Amino acid sequence: MKKLFLDANVLFSAAWREDSGLWRLGKLPKAKLLTSGYAVEEARRNLDDDEQKRRLTMFLSKIEIVPDCPDQILPVKLAEKDLPILQAAIGHRADFLVTGDHRHFGALFGKNVGGVRIISPADVMKRFD
């Protein structure tokens, strides 16, 4: 079973729209979903209404929330707000970091960083669906 660490923007997007295809991630039979408390709080902070927050809570019921790993050394430079995401993915030995953040992770897409391959949600569905 592969461990998929979900970035805050994936959590946010799943909660934003009731019909988001990201809900399919929770049904992948060969994947274990992880995220961190930091990612959850970032997603929650950016949601506007109670219905979206309710959907986030429902989506999180399919995901293991792991501790942050602030002492994890990173082999790459990232924006300050993205450091805890990659640190937790590496620290918890995720196979993949799933993110839609092309602005900050774009140059790293498809690459292994500290043992974690950075991919988009669409790439996950191609690999696992």
Residue map of PLM features:
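Residue-level detector of structured alpha->beta connecting loops
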Residues: 30, 64, 93-94
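Acidic, metal-associated active-site segment
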Residues: 80-97
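Short, structured coil segments at secondary-structure junctions
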Residues: 29, 61, 112-114
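Acidic, PIN/NYN-like endoribonuclease modules and their adjacent C-terminal/linker elements
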Residues: 76, 83, 103-129
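PIN/NYN-family metal-dependent endoribonuclease catalytic core
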Residues: 6, 18-48
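Metal-dependent nucleic-acid phosphoesterase active-site entry motif
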Residues: 1-19
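Short secondary-structure boundary segments
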Residues: 37, 100-102
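Acidic catalytic patch
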Residues: 57-77
